[in-house]
């Protein structure tokens, strides 16, 4: 849980930077589904921060807690070459290769 909070805090800190001079797109890859009570709060926070900072964000998560699917989502996010990628990391061993990409 601590890692999740630190990830969200890091994203919000990053989002607080001035973005007026350039367009930013960010992809958030979470292991928590947006329909889960906890993760719905996190997704709403991401959406709110992105709206406030006028940046384009996309929140993605696997349909269930699935590290293989999450790795695919991370790989897909990397291939889109956004300005930023924010991830949660519930299993570093399973996601390490995708994260290093």
Predicted regions mapped to residue ranges:
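A residue-level marker of the well-folded mature domains of exported/periplasmic proteins
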Residues: 2-5, 21-101
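Bacterial N-terminal signal peptides
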Residues: 7-20
């Amino acid at each position: 849980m601590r890692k999740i909070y630190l990830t969200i805090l890091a994203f919000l800190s990053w989002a607080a930077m001035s973005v007026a001079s350039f367009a930013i797109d960010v992809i958030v890859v979470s292991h928590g589904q947006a329909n889960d009570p906890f993760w719905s709060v996190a997704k709403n926070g991401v959406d709110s921060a992105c709206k406030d900072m006028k940046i384009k964000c996309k929140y993605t998560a696997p349909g269930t807690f699935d590290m293989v699917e999450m790795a695919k989502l991370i790989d897909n996010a990397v291939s889109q070459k956004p300005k930023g990628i924010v991830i949660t990391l519930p299993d570093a061993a399973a996601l390490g290769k995708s994260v290093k990409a």
